[in-house]
Amino acid sequence: MAYRKMLKSKIHRACVTQADLDYEGSITISPELLKVANILPYEAVNVWNITAGTRFETYAITGEKGSTDICVNGAAAHLVTPGDLVIIASFTQILEEDCAAHEPTVVFVDQFNRLKEIRPERIGVKSRIPNPA
């Protein structure tokens, strides 16, 4: 049986509210966002900084209920600045024959990290460059 690593879910365009160098590592996310993104505490996540272009892997920890904080902790705090927009992505292993039917979940948040929309990932990129034809 062959497995493929596939995107499970992502929190799209979250705003970093804090960077704490003195904490042991991780990214702090509200329990509400973790739940809708199907990310468990201590689960590995990739963080892609839209603002700075940096990428790193860490693990999620649960923040305070009702909080809108996104706090990058430990050494990774060097890679973000409060106000940066990030994508927080989780992955799963799926049997190859099940990959075609797989639909990752995208959690959209507003500028204050409040839930805006949840939907399956849509395949396809809209080009911003006009077709020269």
UniProtKB/Swiss-Prot annotation:
Question: Which reaction is the catalytic activity of this chain?
Answer: L-aspartate + H(+) = beta-alanine + CO2
The protein's annotated pathway: Cofactor biosynthesis; (R)-pantothenate biosynthesis; beta-alanine from L-aspartate: step 1/1
Q: What is its EC number?
A: 4.1.1.11
Keyword Chaperone appears in the UniProt entry: no
Q: Which CDD domains match?
A: Asp_decarbox
- Kindly report, in one word, the top-level EC class recorded for this enzyme: lyase
Give start-end of the signal peptide. none
Alphabetical list of Gene3D superfamilies matching this protein? 2.40.40.20
User: What's the superkingdom here?
Assistant: Bacteria
Record-listed Pyruvic acid (Ser) modification sites: 26
UniProt keyword list: Autocatalytic cleavage, Cytoplasm, Decarboxylase, Lyase, Pantothenate biosynthesis, Pyruvate, Schiff base, Zymogen
**InterPro entries attached here?**
Asp_de-COase-like_dom_sf, Asp_decarbox
Which residues does substrate bind?
Answer: 58, 74-76
Q: How is the cofactor bound?
A: Binds 1 pyruvoyl group covalently per subunit.
Share the record's PTM remark. Is synthesized initially as an inactive proenzyme, which is activated by self-cleavage at a specific serine bond to produce a beta-subunit with a hydroxyl group at its C-terminus and an alpha-subunit with a pyruvoyl group at its N-terminus.
Q: From the Swiss-Prot or TrEMBL record, what is one GO molecular function term?
A: aspartate 1-decarboxylase activity
Instruction: Give its localization.
Output: Cytoplasm
What role does it play?
A: Catalyzes the pyruvoyl-dependent decarboxylation of aspartate to produce beta-alanine.
What is stated as this protein's family in its record? Answer: Belongs to the PanD family.
Which NCBIfam families does this chain map to? panD (TIGR00223)
This chain belongs to which protein, by name? Aspartate 1-decarboxylase
Instruction: Please tell me the species this chain comes from.
Output: Legionella pneumophila subsp. pneumophila (strain Philadelphia 1 / ATCC 33152 / DSM 7513)
What's the gene? panD
